Amino acid sequence: MKKSLAALSATLVLSLPAAHAANNVGQCVYPKTKVGANGNLVFRHPIYVLDAPNATAPKRALTAFAAFTVKAEAPGGFVQLVTVPNYDLPNPDSVAGKVIGWAKLSDFDFQELRNCN
């Protein structure tokens, strides 16, 4: 009984990180950046936002150094990005939840939800 309980506990503990990592919906992401020659943040490389989750969809360059929330995931590493509240405004939620488009998750770093603003 103790062996089976220990085995079950170990299995559950080992499966938790995999289950958490399998779905990024609701996570906060920020574009990957580096410090430029003038000391300001710059994108590591151009980040494109697409109208649909495929590489042939119309695209535009991301220009905002801002955090986003992942609304949905699609095959190929695409995530749908939505805006987060802007606490510099009188009504922070007025700009939250607007769909930006689809982007590659590999172009973003995860950020703690408490810092997602």
Regions inferred by a protein language model and the residue ranges of each:
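SH3/SH3-like (including bacterial SH3b) beta-barrel domains
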Residues: 51-64, 70
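Extracytoplasmic/periplasm-facing segments of secreted or lipoprotein envelope proteins
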Residues: 34-56
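Boundary regions of SH3-family modules and the immediately adjacent low-complexity/disordered segments
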Residues: 22-35, 83-117
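Bacterial N-terminal signal peptides
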Residues: 9-15
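Short aromatic-glycine-enriched beta-strand elements
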Residues: 76-80
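Bacterial N-terminal signal peptides that target proteins for export
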Residues: 1-8
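A structural signal for short, hydrophobic beta-strand segments that form beta-sheets
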Residues: 26-41, 67-73
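Sec/Tat signal peptide C-region and signal peptidase I cleavage site
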Residues: 16-21
